């Protein structure tokens, strides 16, 4: 599902533990780390997509997390030209994302990366809240910064910039 401007609706997930650290996951087959994220399917609300992606990508169920906050609006990033498939119709030029801050309320052993076929991630770790800003691929960095700044005041443990 791509909107009239060429952006694919998507949800981004910042999952925090009791210490204010966030889940940082490595994409399978790549040396690229990111927050879990995924597309919103036709007829889904952002919250429904959030819970579907949470289950598919990291094995968590709604009862394993608490929604703390979400971004007020959509945050957009454009894909680099090398990632744009100009032969597709419609052409996707980027993602528009609704970001959610979640608190893990279950033991971390519930996190499972192997439920999707194929899996999205092959490794994960807890990192400090601001660590991802220096690590994420450049074209996503501005959206990460905007989402993290907007959501940081709602963290279970304060992690102000």
Curated annotation (Swiss-Prot):
Protein name (record): RNA pyrophosphohydrolase
HAMAP family, sorted: Nudix_RppH
UniProt record similarity statement: Belongs to the Nudix hydrolase family. RppH subfamily.
Keyword Hydrolase: yes
EC numbers for this chain: 3.6.1.-
One MF term in the entry's GO annotations: pyrophosphatase activity
Keyword terms of this UniProt record: Hydrolase
InterPro entries listed in its UniProt record: Nudix_hydrolase, NUDIX_hydrolase-like_dom_sf, NUDIX_hydrolase_CS, NUDIX_hydrolase_dom, RppH
Motif (Nudix box): 38-59
Functional description taken from the UniProt entry: Accelerates the degradation of transcripts by removing pyrophosphate from the 5'-end of triphosphorylated RNA, leading to a more labile monophosphorylated state that can stimulate subsequent ribonuclease cleavage.
Residue ranges constituting the Nudix hydrolase domain according to the UniProt record: 6-149
Top-level taxon of the source organism: Bacteria
PROSITE patterns, per the entry: NUDIX, NUDIX_BOX
Leading EC class: hydrolase
One Pfam family linked to the record: NUDIX
Cofactor: a divalent metal cation
């Amino acid at each position: 599902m791509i909107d009239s401007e060429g952006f694919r609706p998507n949800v981004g997930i910042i999952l925090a533990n009791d210490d204010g650290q966030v889940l940082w996951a490595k994409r399978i087959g790549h040396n690229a780390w990111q927050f879990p994220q995924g597309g919103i399917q036709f007829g889904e609300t952002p919250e429904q997509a959030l819970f579907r992606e949470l289950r598919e990508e990291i094995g968590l169920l709604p009862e394993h997390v608490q929604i703390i906050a979400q971004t007020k609006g959509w945050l957009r990033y454009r894909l680099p030209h090398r990632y744009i498939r100009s032969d597709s119709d419609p052409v996707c030029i980027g993602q528009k994302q609704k970001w959610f801050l979640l608190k893990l309320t279950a033991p971390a052993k519930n996190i499972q990366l192997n439920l999707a076929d194929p899996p999205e991630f092959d490794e994960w770790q807890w990192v400090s809240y601001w660590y991802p800003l220096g690590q994420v691929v450049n074209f996503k960095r501005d959206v990460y910064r905007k989402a993290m700044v907007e959501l940081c005041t709602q963290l279970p443990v304060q992690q102000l910039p």
